[in-house]
Amino acid sequence: MSKVLVLKSSILGGYSQSALLVDHLIGKWEDQGATITVRDLAGKDVLPMVDGEIASGLRGGAELTARQQEMLDLSNALVEELKANDTIVITAPMYNFNIPTQLKNWIDFVARAGVTFTYTENGPKGLVEGKRAVLITTRGGAHKDGPTDHIVPFLKTFLGFIGITDVEVVYGEALNMGPEANQKGISEAKQSLDALTV
């Protein structure tokens, strides 16, 4: 039975179009027997912003403050959750040409040298291998494959850096460019999601 981790990152709650799309995928994959864990990074599972104290604590050590130990334990749990699943589904709405802060916080908690990647004499090597990722990215305008789409290249780089190179991307494009464009963008995204198997 396939295990799936879903990361929601929209700040828009019930108005979120990326959440609408990922919920469509969740329903489809649950019907196929997948075990799905949902982490709502902008809702009930919001993470702290990584500051200097936390960043230092994530390196470990014998003399951590209580806050550093708490954040290290949280990071370890997030990494364990990531490694325990077969497929990672990431929602990435475009906010001012970038990913939501809440998603970047998760990345900062799981991107750890010696834990999810390592440096070798031949360069960096990812330690989270044998996984698949699905990116669901929504945006108000039309940015796919253009110079204003920084989201997909960034997330593919991050995922590849930690060892996840099997990445599929589903786009919800031009969602704020009028009712017809919205309907078309959502419909095309759902068709792409329907083509994915768990």
From Swiss-Prot:
Pfam families hit by this protein: Flavodoxin_2 (PF02525)
InterPro entries according to UniProt: Flavodoxin_fold, Flavoprotein-like_sf, FMN-dep_NADH:Q_OxRdtase_AzoR1, NADH:quinone_OxRdtase_FMN_depd
Catalytic reactions of this protein: 2 a quinone + NADH + H(+) = 2 a 1,4-benzosemiquinone + NAD(+); N,N-dimethyl-1,4-phenylenediamine + anthranilate + 2 NAD(+) = 2-(4-dimethylaminophenyl)diazenylbenzoate + 2 NADH + 2 H(+)
Class of enzymatic activity (EC top level): oxidoreductase
EC numbers for this chain: 1.6.5.-, 1.7.1.17
Co-factor binding comment: Binds 1 FMN per subunit.
MF terms in GO: electron transfer activity; FMN binding; oxidoreductase activity, acting on NAD(P)H as acceptor; oxidoreductase activity, acting on NAD(P)H, quinone or similar compound as acceptor
Binding site for FMN: S10, S16, Q17, S18, M94, Y95, N96, F97, T138, R139, G140, G141
Cofactor(s) the protein needs: FMN
Record keywords: Flavoprotein, FMN, NAD, Oxidoreductase
Keyword Disulfide bond appears in the UniProt entry: no
Family stated for the protein in its record: Belongs to the azoreductase type 1 family.
Protein role: Quinone reductase that provides resistance to thiol-specific stress caused by electrophilic quinones. Also exhibits azoreductase activity. Catalyzes the reductive cleavage of the azo bond in aromatic azo compounds to the corresponding amines.
Alphabetized PANTHER family for the sequence: FMN-DEPENDENT NADH-AZOREDUCTASE 1 (PTHR43741), FMN-DEPENDENT NADH:QUINONE OXIDOREDUCTASE (PTHR43741:SF2)
HAMAP family assigned: Azoreductase_type1
Description of how the protein assembles with itself and partners: Homodimer.
This protein's name: FMN-dependent NADH:quinone oxidoreductase
Lineage: Bacteria, Pseudomonadati, Pseudomonadota, Gammaproteobacteria, Alteromonadales
